[in-house]
Amino acid sequence: MKLLKDSGAALLALFFVLVYLLPVNSRLLWQPDETRYAEISREMLQRGDWVVPYFMDIRYFEKPVAGYWFNNISQWIFGDSNFAVRFGSIFSTALSAVLVYWLATLLWRNRSTSVLATLIYLSFLLVFGIGTYAVLDPMISLWLTAAMVSFYLTLKAENWQQKVGAYALLGVACGMGFMTKGFLALAVPVIAVLPIVIQQKRIKDLVVFGPIAIVCAVLLSLPWALAIAQREPDFWNYFFWVEHIQRFAEASAQHKSPIWYYLPILCIGVLPWLGLLPGALFKGWRERATKPELFFLLSWVVMPLLFFSVAKGKLPTYILPCMAPLSLLMAAYATDCANNIRMRALKINGVINLLFGVACALVIVVIGLGLVKDIVAYGPQENQKVWLGVLAFAGWGVTGFITLRNNARNWRWAAACPLLFILLVGYLIPQQVVDSKQPQNFIKNNFSELSSSRYVLTDSVGVAAGLAWELKRSDILMFSEKGELTYGLAYPDSQDNYISNDDFPTWLAQARKKGDVSLVVQLARNEALPAHLPSADKVNLMNRLALLWYQKTP
């Protein structure tokens, strides 16, 4: 315990290296998300075009461009590696952690509490899971965190010059957020600050100085917004109506889920600190009058959470911006409990980690040994993965037990509960999942046929992205299914990138005259190869992915 308090910064740096840097290159990329963002940035670098996103030579208007820039720079510096693909997310998470530390220092002027808040943030299961995963959510979370820190500076500004500067920073953060994921970056800060503005009677300041933030956000994003409007006039129409209105509000929204969807996600996401969640939130509400900084954090957590819960389209990644203020609330609550020797919540947290680790280890044993007839996760040759999984979660439980000893004096070590799991998770994934969701393994095993093929087709966008990334070619064709490329494939100059089921036999006969053809098909569980496909010269089936290789004909 004393070691953690005296060497907090060094241990924090060690934790970050162990969790966020060392293991990520050895983990295969997941489809569709990681393969998609890897390939988009690879093509941007190859084209030298940082304005219009293309995905396998097809226009891709689902997101603005700033998030891709992070990934572009990562690949430019670190090359073609899984680490490079994920470094944009890792770097964004690191900057968010720095902002958490800085804001904690501004709030409480206590180095120990600042280190604790940062440690809690980095050890959240949700933050780790998304922060080492190649998606754009860590980037938008960074800019939303920066926006809220900037807003806090507006509250503490002592003169009009400081207020102008703070609101300008707020505008820059919102502008970068807008260029990363769109209008969401403008809506969330407004929703989060409204209760704070009302409580602290700062409506006049918001009205007077708020336009400065708007002007700065507009000036920052305007050059790219005009450039893409000139190059692709339909971008803003598609991006606003389809990617915002339909995704979040309409009955046809993607990823529809019930209003309570985020409750279990939040509980799992804050592990290994779940025991502090109720007390931290209650403390923020109970002390809202005497400690307005706690209400600031509470509003920052609750208002975006309510907004995302009301929206029809939901994904676990959406609530990542709520984790920064939650880590600060938990740090304040835990420090208060420890200082006043009220150890009940800290003990409960230890018990939760102990039970969670034991329960997960038992589940892996039961499923891994095939004791549940209808659930087959691991094959007969994967016993090593089963026991590694047991070891990972046993480590979680044992660490939870250690935090309970001596009246929970070692409660800070809860951050180490998921450490073994994090280091081993890449080696625990069942082979059937690897072969369906991590196409790099399949591509590696079929690289000779794929790399020599004149044409490569697939019926899965995620697999197509993996093929494009691994083969370093953007001319992968879509077969039978269009998926998220439906809009881009509608452009006249992209229609040849899609081959329908009905057209495939005729197209194949002509294509084989020019070279070998590889067709990669993703199958449903226990599905046989489609009988209507022309007979291939070679077939390689690996669980749910199949390669049909057609040799060049004279």
UniProtKB/Swiss-Prot annotation:
Cite the entry's keywords alphabetically. Cell inner membrane, Cell membrane, Glycosyltransferase, Lipid A biosynthesis, Lipid biosynthesis, Lipid metabolism, Lipopolysaccharide biosynthesis, Membrane, Transferase, Transmembrane, Transmembrane helix
Q: Which domain of life is it from?
A: Bacteria
Q: How does it sit in the membrane?
A: Multi-pass membrane protein
The reaction(s) catalysed by this protein are:
4-amino-4-deoxy-alpha-L-arabinopyranosyl di-trans,octa-cis-undecaprenyl phosphate + lipid IVA = lipid IIA + di-trans,octa-cis-undecaprenyl phosphate
Q: Does the keyword Ribonucleoprotein apply?
A: no
Q: Look up keyword Transmembrane and say if it applies.
A: yes
Subcellular localization, as worded in the UniProt entry:
Cell inner membrane
Q: What class of enzyme is it?
A: transferase
Q: For this chain's UniProt record, which GO biological process terms are given?
A: lipid A biosynthetic process; lipopolysaccharide biosynthetic process; protein O-linked glycosylation; response to iron(III) ion
List the Pfam families. PMT
Which InterPro entries does this entry report, sorted A to Z?
ArnT_tfrase, Glyco_trans_39/83, LipidA_mod_glycosyltrf_83
Q: In which pathway does it act?
A: Lipopolysaccharide metabolism; 4-amino-4-deoxy-beta-L-arabinose-lipid A biosynthesis
- Which Gene Ontology molecular-function terms are recorded? 4-amino-4-deoxy-L-arabinose transferase activity; mannosyltransferase activity
Q: Which residues cross the membrane?
A: 4-24, 87-107, 115-135, 178-198, 206-226, 262-282, 293-313, 315-335, 351-371, 384-404, 414-434
Stated family = Belongs to the glycosyltransferase 83 family.
Task: Kindly provide the name given to this protein in its UniProt entry.
Answer: Undecaprenyl phosphate-alpha-4-amino-4-deoxy-L-arabinose arabinosyl transferase
Q: Which organism is it from?
A: Yersinia pseudotuberculosis serotype O:3 (strain YPIII)
Write the gene name. Answer: arnT
